Regions:
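Membrane-embedded alpha-helices of multi-pass transport/permease systems
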Residues: 44, 108-124
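Alpha-helical transmembrane segments
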Residues: 95-106, 162-169
Length: 214
């Protein structure tokens, strides 16, 4: 698939800079190292670690079978939130599930923006994405995702810390999402990429907003 998409055709595997065999060896080494790290934690975290592998190996195939691969990316990419909490507390609380859900909506939004760059190629080769499913109402869909993410974060902070301790950095996180919706245009790949890259800072604001209040 990467060979047929303008944005991804120069990736190492797609342009034969490395072989599939070498990629598999490299992946095996990384998985082995990850396993050695994983078994240092409690049983719950180890279980969650193995569960994450199911998501990680299933995700690359989602574009072939569903218009919601970005949702599966959200489940997979943010699984570390739950694992980190389990590693520290040896439990899974409702607060961390709220944070996980917020992160899923965030990922669903920003990866829909990212995928907009590839809509023309994706439609030709027959793969699916939320960027294609909602291409006629993409700003509305991304706005909904970001609104859901923001609402869950606000609820989490309010229930956990109260309004008096609400973090300015979390407000900046929310405003950065609003700014993305304003600037990206579905027919302008450069603006889509620019909006997507803002999420590097969005995540940083959210991290420090949570970290500093604790």
């Amino acid at each position: 698939i990467d060979k047929k998409v303008q944005r991804t055709k120069n990736r190492p595997l797609a342009c034969n800079l490395i072989s599939v065999k070498l990629a598999l060896i490299y992946t095996s080494v990384l998985c082995s190292l990850a396993f050695l790290i994983l078994i240092q934690f409690n049983i719950l975290t180890i279980f969650l670690g193995f569960a994450s592998m199911v998501l990680a190996f299933a995700y690359p195939f989602m574009k072939r079978i569903t218009y919601w691969p970005q949702f599966f990316l959200g489940l997979t990419f943010n699984w570390g939130i739950v694992m980190a909490w389990a590693a520290i507390t040896n439990n899974i609380s409702y607060e961390i599930l709220i944070l996980y859900a917020s992160a899923i909506f965030w990922t669903l939004g920003y990866d829909t923006i990212y995928g907009t760059q590839d809509v023309a190629d994706d439609e030709i080769i027959g793969i699916k994405s939320t960027s294609i499913k909602f291409k006629n109402n993409i700003k509305l869909f991304v706005s909904f995702c970001y609104l859901a993410s923001s609402a869950l974060i606000i609820y989490l902070f309010y229930s956990k810390f109260g309004l008096n301790n609400f973090s300015l950095l979390v407000i900046i996180y929310i405003l950065s999402l609003v700014y993305q919706v304003i600037i990206f245009e579905k027919n302008d790949p450069k603006k889509c990429l620019r909006a997507f890259k803002i999420n590097n800072f969005s995540g940083l604001f959210l991290f420090f907003g949570i970290f500093l209040i604790n």
